[in-house]
Structure formats: structure tokens, C-alpha cells
Amino acid sequence: MSAANWCENAVFYEVLVRTFQDSNGDGVGDFEGLESRLDYLQWLGVDCLWLPPFFASPLDDGGYDVADFLSTHPDFGSVEQLSHLLDAAHSRGMRVIADLPLNHTSIAHQWWREELEALRAIDAGTLDAADFTPRYVWSTTGEEYADARVIFEDTETSNWTFEPSVGRFYWHRFFSHQPDLNYDNPAVQEDMLDVLRFWLSKGLDGFRLDAVPYLYERHGTNGENLPETHAYLARVRAMVDEEFPGCVLIAEANQWPRDVVDYFGSEEAPECHMCFHFPLMPRIFLSFARGEASSIDRILADTPQLPAGAVWGTFLRNHDELTLEMVDDVERADLYARYAPEPRMRANVGIRRRLLPLLGSAEAVECAVAMLLSMPGAPFLYYGDEIGMADDIWLVDRDGVRTPMQWDGSTNAGFSPQSSYPPVLSTMPNVQAALADPTSLLYAHRRLIAQRKAVFDASDDWCIVASDEVFAFERAGVLCAFNVTAEPQSVTVAGIEVYLPGHGYAWVPLVDRVLPHLVGQRFYGGSADSSGVQIVRAESWQFGGVWLTVESAGAFYRTLVDATGRDLLAQYAAEGDDAAGAGVGVDVVGYVRGLLAERGHTLVGDVQAQRVGGEQSNTSFVVGSWVVKFQRRLAEGVNPEVLVADALADCPHAAHVVAHDEGACVATVVPLVDGARDGWELALERGLVGDDSGEGVDVAGLGAAIACVHAALDEGHVQRRENLLDCLRERMVRTGTQAGLGDALSSGLIEVLSNTGAGSDQVPVQRVHGDLHLGQVLWDSSRWVLIDFEGEPAATPAERAAEHSPMKDLAGMIRSFDYATQVRARENAASSSTAADAGAGAVEQATQVLLDGYRQAGGTVDEALLQAYLLDKALYEYDYELHHRPDFRYIPARALKALGIATPE
């Protein structure tokens, strides 16, 4: 194992051996049971297990009442079984630390029994008091150290308890059955060092040192943080560093950060590698209770700078009560009122409840966990909180938050049917059910942990930028924002408008993280230089991830991201059904189900989301009997596809929009053409017209389908031919100039456009498909269906909604014929040297069949205008291929040459 700095980035997970998993049918968790669940913990992303005391104990205080530091509790297993557990964890890349109660023992400890015997011997005169150094702290009056507070004030009235068998009072900072050790006795110091040596030599990776501020007592002090305590901890650290390098020490000191920081020690005398930040935890809950985050900001502002290599341990819940010692009376009253209105919900100066019952919703839990995982420090999670386990306020002390882990829906939740204590809860969220639901809190934990590891580092600086209803900070190129209220909130941070639902959060990757994943996406046409890119909006999406609106050169793009900056829809499409398990966590199915329900439609059955193949400027998925399309480029105005939905509702050859969303996610849903294949795929497989290499496709039927769609969209509008040609000319000049065609374009345009003036002065115009090609038509074995009426992706909504001659769609399809035949010819070139020429002949033949089918279905073909639109489309293709796919430039170049426009070789 490596040096002890491994803890700086680790995710810790507290697991009670007694209640995690039993292996031998006795209903009590044990080492072998825990070992059997290591794969689950590895899957979750846990780096280090934290085990509360597993030593021999009467278990009057959950094992913190130790009866023998050098043996294990027999119910949990043997020392050898523990060693096997440690080896199994290490083989999975996980470490294991344990609690060590340095301060006290149980009255069942042999040391205590020997102490009482010695004191009785002194009183009897059989032992010289000068030969006796007590292991515990005694008084004849019980009046010493009066300035030390009583910690468990609801069960203990004093830190002294009278022991009648010896006629003396003994000192205990905790329960009266846990007498404090006397660290002024050198033998106690050595014995406890030997305890550490024993377990570290067995393979433990460190200790959480329980209750370290109270090791020594001095008159006139509060008995906390004494110089002698720090001196002893420095001695412990020196031994660990020398004899067990790579092992860690963690201080449990429930005090203000300015006091706790001393437990890190100094450069000359280091003490603990980590310390818990106790005051932060209740202030996170206070922020959710009050709906304002300033209390978090204030405690962080009061937190001193850490020494190099030192790490705060942060947490939300653990095996103890949610301690409220480090808040004032007003804050404590607010916390009790919000989270523990019933007295049974309280313990000591705190609240004995689990995370989900405290915060009240999975959304609030996920928000709080995301906050914990993105803050500096090493986060500690508590077993069962990842599945939303409840608590039992009717159990004694803190046992209500220590109930058995719930693995499945069986009677005993995966434990053997023997009775267990604490008993299994009647409410049954469980791991098995959570694993079957990619939207579960469990999967959310896994995704958050994975993103934390991919993005954040212990050395990252951070800057708090908002602390009202939204707590926000910037760290490691990620803007982290958390809405601590139940109402939607927005805040502008670093120029980004951040929108969050109630108790929502967003990890917003900044430009340098997002841009590498954007460049190369089909929908992105912006700059590859971060100086030319700006994130203007971020919106947390309830179905997973954060929608970013990215601006570059006046264009706006949409990408759904996590903290790494990767595009989650692209990742989802790449990983398919395993996307949620791989950490993507986008619920496309749930989104479509809800969107359809709002419009009175139903998504039937247990369905998956499958990516629609082919290159698209948007991202589409088949979900059951529907297709959802996520818009990736934004512009002002109504989506053109929505505008024609009503007109196409009764057309059998059009997949029209039945539901759309203009909120955080801009998307449309259309019916799926069941069992259909797109025209591009068919053309490559069969050829356009029947020949020796393929049976061909129904091109005539395609022409008829296009005519049917045009008839549905026709509103009887006309435009002067001259005006239409002027618009086409202007567009073609602009496109050709971008492509560097220059004078060749000018002369070619004159020749082509001179032939378009013949015919009626009034030209029919209407809303058309606008981006028609073989990839936009589906064949279901009996009919063609046109899809995606959005128009040209690069155009504005106004341009896409503009009326054109129907010849625009026919020209687009004919140009697609050319591409399909050329690509097919290219694939068959090895076996046929004349394939390209044969392909050209196939295009001419298919074009004629298409136009005949169009006419027979009632469409009118304006041959002159068709030529103009063919030139316009070929110029657009040439410019696109020149800048994006140079290897395909030859296809539109051949078409331009046939139209009289020469292109560079």
C-alpha cells in the first residue's frame, strides 16, 4: 500500500459489522458476512471501510465499551477471520480502518477487575500503595475537575461515579460503565501503543481515535485539548510512521475547527493525518431547515488553513446522534423543531435519526450528499443511507440508526431468519430493489462518487461564490451549486445563469472541461478555442445531469453533462442499456413517459431507450413505440416541427409531433414507425433500382409519399418566380463564396438560372420538409414515412419555417440518391471497375421514377426550379464536405461539374 496521503481523496464508508451481514445463521453480522458484501462496496466506489469497535465487549455502548483490546467479539468472528477480511478488501483496492476508544474501557475489562482487587488490597494492607500506579482515575471526594462538562447529560449527572466495593469515585467522561484510563500512568501509554501495533500488524490501515480530547485531566481546566494529550498523540504518530508507514490516524474531536486543527500537530511533531469537522455537519442540516446557506459559509470562514497534507473528514450521519453541541441555543431549537419534534427522536445533545427521515426526500438527500462529495476533505458515508434506510425511534439510545442493512425484500432483508438486535426495520428500501432502478438513490450515490474521483483532488483550491438560498462554490473547473430550499431557485454565478429545482443541485463543468467533449460532436459548429466559447445557462435536469447552453460565435448549443464535461446523451447512446450502470444516469425512458402522459398518451410496458442510428445534428432515441429527439442547436422562435404537427396529423406518410418540451430540455416526441428501416440503409443494401447487386427500393412509392406530405402542408400560397430565384441566387453566391468557387460559380449560375425563368410567373410555395434525404424516410414494408420536419439544422427557426417550392424537397432526395449510389459504388469498387459509372446511371433512373411517382400522386414538377434547387443543394454539400469530410468532397463536385460549375481538383 502507498503512503498515508491516500486518505486525501478517499471516500470512506462506515459499516457496523454487527448489522451489515451475517454468514452463519445467527442473525448477527460478522466478518465473513461483511467480506461477502465487498463486491457491492467496490461497485459503489468505496475506497476505505470504517469499522466501529469489533473488540470483545458487553456491547452496552455498541462496542465502545471494550473488554479486551487484543481480541475480537466472538459473535463477529475470530482474529483470523478479520485478517482474511482485510486481505479480501486489499485485493479489491480498498482499505480498512477501525475505531479505537483510547480514552476508556468497559467495567468488564480485566484491567478494571485487577484495579479493584489492587485497591481492596491496599485498603486491607496487603499491598503497599507506593507500589501501585492506577490504570484508572480515582477520587475520594468526587469533586475534582469540576470545570469539565458532562457530555451525556441526559443519562449522567456527573463525571464521577462511586464504586462501593473500594469506597472511591472513578472518573468517566462518557457512560458510568466506561471508566477513563489514566494516561499519567506510563504503563497505560505503552499498553495502548501495543494495541495499535497488534492490529496494524494484522493488516488494518489505520484508526479513528475515538474521544481523543479527553485523555488527560488537569485541575483548573475543562479537561480537553491538554498539552499532554497532544504530546501523547505525537508519540503515537511517530510510532505509526516509523513502524507502519501508509497507515492513518483520524482524530474524533467534537470541537471548533480552531481547536481541532491542533490535532494535526506541527511539522516538527505531527499528530493525526485527519480530523473530523464536526461543526460543519449540523450547519448543513440547518441550511436545509432554514432555507438559507449562510450558516455553512460562516463556519467555513471560521475554519483555519490546514497544514500541508492534513485533511478534514466530513460527514452527514454516522452511528452516533446528530450532535448539536457545536450550535447555539437558537440554532439548536430550530434543528430540533425541524428534525426532531418528538422527544424520542433526540439523544444526548443531538438527534438520533437517519439521513432520509431527516431531510424528508430523496432529492434533498442527493443534494446534501453531492454537497458533501464536492467539498474539500474526505467524505464519510454511513451504511444504508445510500438506499434511503429509515430509523426506529422506539429503540433505546442510538440503536434506532444502527439497524440491519437491508439487502433484499425478504422477511429479514437478507439476514438469516434468526432474531437480530437491533431488529430489521419494517420499511424495506433495499439494495436489490435499488439495483433494479437506475433512478434510485443508490445509483445516484455511485454516479456522484465516480464523478468526484474523476474531477476533484485534495489539492484543489475552492472559492465560495454564493450563500443565500443557493450555496455555490467553484472548484477544479466545476461550479457546484446547491439549492437548500424546497422551491426552484436561480442564481447568476461567473456569468452563468444556474437554474435549480427545489432541493436540486448542479455540478456545472466550466468551458475548459466541456469543450474537449463538444468539439467533434456533429451538432457543434462553434470554436475549438475556449476563448471563443461561453456557458450562458445551466439547468439541473430531474432526469439526470445538467443541461448547458453554450454560446460560440452567436450560435447556441445544448449539451447534457455531468461534472466531467462529457455529453451524457452521447455516452448513453454509446452504452445503451448499461448506461445507468456505467454511471451515466440519464433517465430517457422516464422523461418520455412523463412527457407523453402530459399529452394524454401512454408509454406501455418495461421499455428501453435505443439510439437512432445515422449522423444527426440532434440526438434521437427509440423508446417503446415512440421516438424522442433532443434538440442540440437553439435559436429564437417555435420549433418548425411543432408548427406543422396539426397539418400532418392525418397524413399516413408523416411522423408528426405528438408531444414537445420547451423547458430545461428542448425535445419532441413522434410515433415510431414500427419495424421500419431508413431509406439510406435500404439503398446501400439493395441499390436504388433493381439490378444484379440488389432488388432496389420502392422509389415510385417514395415519390408518392412526398407528394402526399406536400399536399397536407399546402395552403395555396404563391410567390413571384423572380423573387424566389433572387433568394436562391443570393444563397448560392454566399455558399459558393464560402467554398472558394469564385468566378466558376458566377458563370455557372448564369447558365443554370437563365433556364429557370420560363413558366408561370407565380410559383407555388409552402412549408416543406426542408432537409429531406434518405435518412429522413422510413420504410415499413408497405409504405414510406417522412420523419424529422425540423428543416436544415444550421438555419434559424424562421428560415426553416419559411415557405419554399416543393422542388426543394425533391432536390434534397435526388442529391441523397447520388450520395447513396456513390457510397455503395465505393464499397463495391474492388469487384467492379465500372461501379461509379453504373451508380451515376442508377441516379438518373431513380430520379425519373421518383418524379413519375410524385406526379402520379398529384404533385407538380417544375423542372427548371428543380435544377436550381439541385445546384443550391450541391453547393451546400460541397461547402460542408470541404470543411468537415474532405474525402467525400468528390460526390458534390461531380454534381457541380454536371451543372457546369468547375471545382478545384
Give short role names for the model-derived ranges:
Residues 1-511:
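Active-site and adjacent substrate-binding regions of carbohydrate-active enzymes
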Residues 512-539:
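Short Lys/Arg-enriched alpha/beta "domain-start" segment
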Residues 543-733, 782-783, 794-829, 836:
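Conserved ATP-binding subdomain of kinase catalytic cores across diverse folds
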Residues 600-607, 733-767:
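An alpha-helical support segment within catalytic cores of ATP-dependent transferases
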Residues 767-770, 774:
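Catalytic-loop of the protein kinase fold
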Residues 776-786:
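Conserved protein kinase catalytic/activation segment
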Residues 788-792:
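Activation of the activation-loop gatekeeper triad in protein kinase-fold domains
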Residues 830-864, 868-905:
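ATP/Mg2+ or Mg2+-diphosphate-binding catalytic cores
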